[in-house]
Amino acid sequence: MPSKNSINRPKQKVNLNRKVHQRAAKRDAMEKKGLLAPARSSGTSKSGQLKSIPLDLYKGEHSTSGALTTKTLSKKRAKKIERNLKYVEQRKLLVDLQSQSEENGGMQIDAPVVKKEKETKKGQLEKMREAISTVLEDIQSQGLSLQTGSGTTLGGQYFL
């Protein structure tokens, strides 16, 4: 069969029939999976939510239509889901604390946070760098001193 853009291309009806057939097959597959069972407008619909079979298995919400299933949950995946759920709870607590602090009128800190700095022994090179930088800062802070003498820059005095 020639391609869609060739000179002796097939009629438009052939292409449209193929697309309609593909969409119908896709729709039937979604109905078999149970994705179209509750309408999108109903409250029990999961439309727009994430679909995760391992998470459903972890929560016990995944229902099997038959007695035999290939959907299992490994220990590694179960631990990962537990860890992620713990992180979700921590984020919720953090958001709640931030909203409470905004309601109370700004930032209120319960305990002051003190950052500990490690005392490091300074080597000879670091001591020299600090000394040079302090000397340069002192020179820059003094400003530029100009000698105010009488005369021009080229030589003797200039009278009007």
From Swiss-Prot:
Superkingdom, according to UniProt?
A: Eukaryota
> Region entry Disordered: which residue ranges?
1-51
Subcellular location per the Swiss-Prot or TrEMBL entry: Cytoplasm; Nucleus
Q: Which GO terms describe its cellular component?
A: cytoplasm; nucleus
Where do the coiled-coil regions begin and end?
none
Q: Which InterPro entries match?
A: Ribosome_bgen_Alb1
Basic residues composition bias: residue spans: 10-24
Q: Which UniProt keywords apply?
A: Cytoplasm, Nucleus, Ribosome biogenesis, Transport
GO biological process assignments: ribosome biogenesis
Q: Please state the protein's primary subcellular location.
A: cytoplasm
**Polar residues: compositionally biased ranges:** 41-50
Biased composition (Basic and acidic residues) is annotated at: 25-34
How this chain assembles, per its entry, is: Component of the nucleoplasmic and cytoplasmic pre-60S ribosomal particles.
| Role played | Involved in proper assembly of pre-ribosomal particles during the biogenesis of the 60S ribosomal subunit. Accompanies the pre-60S particles to the cytoplasm.
Instruction: Tell me the protein family, please.
Output: Belongs to the ALB1 family.
Protein's name according to its UniProt entry: Ribosome biogenesis protein ALB1
Which organism is this protein's natural source? Answer: Kluyveromyces lactis (strain ATCC 8585 / CBS 2359 / DSM 70799 / NBRC 1267 / NRRL Y-1140 / WM37)
Identify the gene encoding this protein. Answer: ALB1
